[in-house]
Amino acid sequence: VRQASALPERERRRGLAVLLVTTFLSWGGFFAVVPLISVHFVDDIGWSAASVGLVLAVRQFLQQGSSSLTGAIADRIGPKPLMCFGMFVRAISFLVLAAAGSYATVMLAAVLMALGGGFFESPQAAATAALTTPADRRRFYALNGTIGGLGTSLGTQLGALLIDSNFATVSMIGAVAFGTIFIVMLVFMPSISVSIGNQGAWSGLRLAVNDRLFVGFNVLLMGFWFMYTQFSISLPLAAKDISGDTSSVAWVYGVNSGVTILLGYLLPRMLERRMGNFPMLVAGIALTAVGMMAIGLVDSLSMLLFCVFVLSLGMVLSRPSQQTISAGLARPDALGAFLGVGALSLAIGGGIGNFTGGVIYDVGKSHDLHWLPWLIFGTIGLLAAVGLSFFRPRFERRHEELSRLSDEVHQT
């Protein structure tokens, strides 16, 4: 196990290439299945949106919650063994989902899916931050998002194509994708260390939890993740309700993926000289919120897709900036622990978003208040944008200080 900064350039690039392949296959496999869980079990099986939202919330909370610990462990043993194990468990989870015939079995699949994701998510984020330099980090995150968008597009189209015949077949696609990642990562991913110090797992976690600025940033991000997770629960249901056709879910994800593929790399590159990371993050979250609110006013699939286009632009702006800032605010001597603690933002915000999103959607639908869920989702996002804008000077000073330190590490 070697320091990432000490790797020869060829090995560093190979590691980044493996991470891009991982992103493509993991997003493709995940989004071939997960968006259709709500459609399949709510519309085809007859479960309530709240019950399915609880399954997705458990998956979200357990995954990001366990990421805190695995991120800290990655500081000690390196990210590769954790990522490999996580991909293997995630593949098993989709096999369980394919055979699921009861609510308990679906919940078991969600728990396994969460544990698998918990083992690879923070270690993968730490590996990405360690293998990139501050100068090229945002560009890599933008490229990574574009690759992920391509995987999402292909995955959702394949899932929509197969969902009418057999949900189990769709789940098997997810299992194959993550099984392939396990093999690729085991063979080609270099073994690296992501921390420059000798912090123990628990001491690294204590540093992260006690860092008020880092924690404050991630608390504010919870509002963004609350909105973001509606892609897994409320948006597929809205597409089906508005159009009356399950295949419309693929159109929603197709628009989102198309924006990500075509603009996910180019738009941040065009704006990076005019806008810093924080203005781009705030603008992206605000635009996503506006797109969410507008969904409550539409009554046709074409208008829904336009709203998806707007909020997808917001996500294209916000996601690379959010990842860059999170990595920049993390201390290099406990990188995995910091990014693991940062994952709690998605665990809490996303978990609440999945469960309450399903509940609020049910309430809005039963009382003929279709605009209500989207007004709530968008308002929460706008509050997050306002909070981030207010504390921006403090975050920027810290980001600049740690970026200089990270530059020094890569140069030595």
Task: Give the predicted meaning of each segment.
Residues 1-13, 190-220, 408-412:
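Juxtamembrane intracellular "pre-TM" segments in multi-pass secondary transporters
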Residues 35-50, 233-248:
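Short amphipathic helix-loop junctions that connect adjacent transmembrane helices
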Residues 60-68, 152-153, 257-265, 350-351:
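Residue-level signature of mid-helix packing/kink "hotspots" within the transmembrane helices
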Residues 66-78, 263-276, 361:
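Helix-to-loop junctions at the C-terminal end of transmembrane segments
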Residues 81-95, 279-293:
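Structural signature of the two symmetry-related core transmembrane helices
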Residues 110-149:
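Cytoplasmic helix-loop-helix junction between adjacent transmembrane helices
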Residues 163-176, 359-381:
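A membrane-interface helix-boundary motif in multi-pass transporters
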Residues 181-189, 376-412:
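Multi-pass alpha-helical transporter architecture, strongest
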